[in-house]
C-alpha cells in the first residue's frame, strides 16, 4: 500500500506539481513509516473547504503535513507563522501553498484570506486551530470565522503519532455556535496522540 496517493482528492483540488515533488512526498512519508488515510469526495468539487490540522505540538507536524501535501499533490493554501518562512525554506513553503502570517495581527490575516478565497472557485485552506505548538485550553475561532466568510465546510485532519497516520476525517458542518463547534471538534481529536502529549 502506498503511503499516499493523489487519487485521495478530486482532480480539481490537485496542483499538478512535477512528478518528482509528488514522489518526494510519498518517499518521505514511507521512509518515516507514515501513511495518509481517508479522502475528499467528488461531491466537494468547486467548493471551498477549510482543512484543520491537529494535534499541533511539534515542528514534525509541519514536515509531515508538507510531505502529505506533496504526496496528495494538493492545491492548498496553508497558514503558518512568518518566522518559519525564512531563507530558502520560505520559498519552498510558499511554492507548496504556505502563507506567512504575523501573529500580532491575526485579524488582518483572516480578512485577507477571506477576500482572496472568495475570488477563487473551489479552494482548500489548511489551518492549525490551536494557533501554536504550546498547550492551549480552547482553540482560536479564526478557522471558524474563515469558514463562515467563504461559506466552507471543514475537513478535520489528524496527525496521530501512535499509529503514524494522517487521517482526512469526515466533513464537519459548522453550526454557527463557535463555542459548541470548537468543543465538538476538540472532543473528536481526543483519540489522537500528539508528538508531545503533555502540550495537547
Question: Where are each of the predicted segments found?
Answer:
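Extreme N-terminal tail/first-helix region
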Residues: 1-37
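Soluble catalytic domains of membrane acyltransferases
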Residues: 3, 14, 34-191, 199-200
